[in-house]
Curated annotation (Swiss-Prot):
Residue span of region Amidoligase domain: 1-267
GO biological process, one term: 'de novo' CTP biosynthetic process
Regulation: Allosterically activated by GTP, when glutamine is the substrate; GTP has no effect on the reaction when ammonia is the substrate. The allosteric effector GTP functions by stabilizing the protein conformation that binds the tetrahedral intermediate(s) formed during glutamine hydrolysis. Inhibited by the product CTP, via allosteric rather than competitive inhibition.
Protein name: CTP synthase
Lineage, broadest ranks: Bacteria, Pseudomonadati, Coprothermobacterota, Coprothermobacteria, Coprothermobacterales
Keyword Ligase: yes
Residues engaged in binding Mg(2+): 73, 141
Organism listed in the record: Coprothermobacter proteolyticus (strain ATCC 35245 / DSM 5265 / OCM 4 / BT)
GO molecular function: ATP binding; CTP synthase activity; glutaminase activity; identical protein binding; metal ion binding
Length: 537
């Protein structure tokens, strides 16, 4: 079988209850005890991956080093564990069914009637074991809510796998929500009781329950949950709302959750080394920076989750607080110059993140012109870098029709155009330039100084690139190419001379930022903002 131990994390009562943060926190606390830890997210949707899903429904698509387009929870796992994960750490129903159907078409099942049990559940178990290879412990989060039809094959696979792993091979941690009535201020455990009943009916008994609530719960609520859900009192944990998601591991450690799980899995309890984590959280904020994030999908902040977290990481490192103002590029498109100045003049820095499609692009052009002309520290990511190029071509080079062929296929000045290998692509899923590629930095540039190394590996997710026909004109007018993918001579980084900080990158640096190791570009952006800003208490 395997020597890896498993923590299976299920969710009850409602979705978005915080399973991902709980799973990431547990993984981080086991790693702090010296274990080699990995994390796996199982998503019951029928999409093969998250790549073609709407950011309004699903939030951001997190891209791994190997180019997998995954659930945003993998971003939480990477940030908390400080480990690079891969496509094998995200299992979807679409991926599983695709594998099973492919095998059936090839005749691998030798004429068997292909069914959910055993064929689909076996494929799920194989994927879990493959994803956990080489780890002492794997935290496996089952997406959705117990009781969902889509989750049943995954929960059945977990039931079977637990049986095969033996009594000390795995634990189940059930994360539920405890509503508190406004009128009586009474915490209601009935939804949790029904959720556990549903979980038991599938054959899974939780070893621990994490009760999510807005405020701390009284002890009698935990005792009642313990009694009615048949979980030892020490295994019933209250995870109430805290100021930052990075406080959650300390809360779970305080509640001794990992001690309960470690004793069950490894027959021992050890101390966690949380010194550096606590030091990171203890830095005092002397001032608050206001950072404008101008994007297309700001209705759902999760669409820019990694960008927001990367800003926070840099802010913590610099000892400042960062207030991120989400601004819709659609709305800014309607503003005149005076209105635009009113919205942006009190901002200390600007980030324009990635996205797809023509909607809202002209709003970004307006914002970036303001930032360029008013010396506002600015970082453009992927689409943001492309719109920087469009704005510069129009307003500095005088190419009034300049555009990307994504937005205007017939533009006279295609400063951004389709990658040659993308010309014949028809399927959208998994067909972009994805994953980590080397970028060679030009010595003497701001970006080279920030990274302090000649070559960096950064993650990509795009089809369009800077058109080298315009490279000479850009550089002659002060927009310098400071990073290249040398094998194909692709422009990866642009930076504006004679500007405090105006940098555009074709990649997604936010995916590699970690709480204790902020990304150099976000550090550079906020450092410049700190230098320019007056203290705001």
């Amino acid at each position: 079988m395997t020597n890896t131990k498993f923590v299976f994390v299920t969710g009850g009562v409602l979705s978005s209850v915080g399973k991902g943060i709980a799973a990431a926190s547990m993984g981080m606390l086991f790693k702090a005890r010296g274990y080699k830890v990995t994390a796996i997210k199982m998503d019951p949707y029928l999409n093969v991956d998250a790549g073609t899903m709407s950011p309004y429904q699903h939030g951001e698509v997190f891209v791994t080093e190997d180019g997998a387009e995954t659930d945003l929870d993998l971003g939480h796992y990477e940030r908390f564990l400080d480990e690079n994960l891969s496509g094998k750490n995200n299992i979807t129903s679409g991926k599983i069914y695709s594998q099973v159907i492919t095998k059936e078409r090839k005749g691998d099942y030798l004429g068997s009637t292909v069914q959910v049990i055993p064929h689909v559940t076996d494929a799920i178990k194989e994927s879990i074991l493959y994803g956990a290879q080489g780890a002492d412990l794997a935290v496996v989060e089952i997406g959705g809510t117990v009781g969902d039809i889509e989750s049943l094959p995954f929960l059945e696979a977990v039931r079977q796998l637990r049986r095969e792993l033996g009594p000390n091979g795995s634990v189940v941690v059930h994360v539920t929500y405890v509503p508190i009535l406004e009128t009586t201020h009474e915490a209601k455990t009935k939804p949790t009781q029904h959720s556990v009943k549903e979980l038991r009916s599938i054959g899974l008994q939780p070893d621990a329950i994490v009760l999510r609530s807005h405020t701390p719960l009284e002890k009698h609520v935990l005792e009642k949950t313990s009694l009615f859900c048949d979980v030892p009192l020490e295994g019933v944990i209250n995870s109430y709302d805290v100021e930052s998601v990075y406080d959650v591991p300390l809360l779970l450690e305080q509640e001794k959750l990992i001690s309960v799980l470690e004793e069950r899995l490894f027959g021992t309890t050890t101390e966690a080394d949380l010194k550096k984590w606590k030091e990171m959280l203890s830095r005092q904020s002397e001032r608050t920076l206001k950072v404008a994030l101008v994007g297309k999908y700001v209705v759902l902040p999760d669409a820019y989750l990694s960008v927001i977290e990367a800003i926070r990481h840099a802010a913590m490192k610099l000892g400042v607080a960062a207030h991120v103002s989400l601004m819709s590029s659609d709305e800014l498109e309607k503003c005149d110059d005076e209105q635009l100045s009113e919205k942006l003049s009190n901002m200390d820095a600007l980030v324009v993140p990635g996205g797809f499609g023509a909607r809202g692009i002209e709003g970004m052009v307006k914002v970036l012109r303001y930032a360029r002309e008013n010396k506002m520290p600015t970082l453009g990511l992927c689409l943001g870098m492309q719109v920087m190029s469009i704005e510069f071509a129009r307003n500095v080079l005088g190419l009034k029709d300049a555009n990307s062929t994504e937005f205007d296929p017939n533009t006279t000045y295609p400063v951004i155009s389709l990658l040659p290998e993308q010309m014949q692509v028809r399927d959208l899923g998994g067909s972009m330039r994805l994953g980590a590629y080397p970028c060679t930095l030009v010595e003497g540039t701001r970006v080279h100084a920030l990274y302090n190394k000649p070559v960096v590996f950064e993650r990509h997710r795009h089809r369009f690139e800077f058109n080298n026909e315009f490279r000479e004109a850009f550089e002659n007018n002060g927009f310098q190419v400071s990073g290249l993918y040398e094998p194909k001579d692709l422009v990866e980084v642009l930076e504006l001379k004679d500007h405090p900080f105006y940098v555009g990158v074709q990649y997604h640096p936010e995916f590699k930022s970690r709480p204790m190791v902020p990304h150099p570009l976000f550090l550079g952006l906020l450092s410049e903002a700190v230098a320019k800003a007056s203290p705001v208490l």
